[in-house]
Amino acid sequence: MYIFAFLPIFALLILENMKKTIYLLAALLLLLSSCKSKKNLVSPIARPVLNTDSIRPDSSDVVARLFAPDTSGLKKLSARRKAAEKRQVASSGITRSIPPVVARGTNITSSAVSVSSVYPGIDRVKRYEFTHRDVPEAFDGFRIAFISDLHYKSLFKEKGLESLVRLLNAQHADVLLMGGDYQEGCQFVPELFAALAKVKTPLGTYGVMGNNDYERCHDEIIREMKRYGMRPLEHQLDTLRRNGEQIILAGVRNPFDLANNGVSPTLSLSPADFVILLVHTPDYAEDVSVANSDLVLAGHTHGGQVRIFGYAPIIPSHYGSRFLTGLKYNSAKIPMIVTNGIGTSNKNIRIGAPAEIVMITLHRLRNE
């Protein structure tokens, strides 16, 4: 009747793992065959005890493997997790590199600095160091300020606008790029652009329109931008020149109307040029070919606007969370920086998606 002492172990291992159950049966057969008399048997007691004295020497390895924890799954999980971490740019305050296998000739790092205590209405400055082999020598160290989704007079109001202007001027950017969705009413457009005109950059200010701006106030925004010397880019190109060298800016007109705007303005450019594509939604860079772009700047998602433990229940993208925020890549491995933006839409609330400005510093890749 001693065999009943092992019934709890049978039950446990059958539930746990069929492979281990087979090992257990093999071990028990070895135990039984090694018993030469009754004194070698394990007596039935309240708590079963394995009599290790009765194990043959050649069966010890089987038993050791049987009772050793199976860590193969953990090792595979750890390997997958490390691989995933290498392909991500860090969240706030941490800097990591994107390996060359993702984007040959490109290296990108990021960090974030909280500024809300000094600049009410703006939570942080998200910084990117963008190193690329096609960056001209004259643009090594070139600083780009990028803002989007102001939705002026939503959660973002007069005090936030004043903070934004001060913060942008404190960055000493060489150019200001804007990603659209500027307003929550046409009556606010003149006030908004009069304030943004106070941002001083050597190479000026450029912008595209967002879906809000095509629904209303499009003509008013274009008029106010031109009044202050800003350049709207609606399926247009412009050239930034510095010390005899240049980079190209391309802007997309209404990226939601692919029937009319489904051919990217970058397709006419040379792969040898360094090209920044400015578009309101990151979906456009996946919906159509944006070949010859070296960097895409987009907004629209608001970083989810409300994120609970990283989960955003509402994301205005037909790709879900794929292009939610931060450094992303389209299927062609073209890097995209997607900003959380500043204002809000629908509900005047932000949780887990800090209002931000983006600062990008270009660097020329010296050695691959």
Q: What is the meaning of each model-derived region?
A:
Residues A5, K19-L25:
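Sec-dependent signal peptide recognition
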Residues G105-N107, V113-S117, E129-T131, F193-L258, ...:
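Extended active-site neighborhood of metal-dependent phosphoesterases/phosphodiesterases
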Residues D123, H132-A145, M230-R231, D238-A250, ...:
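Beta-strand-turn-beta hairpins that frame and shape the catalytic cleft
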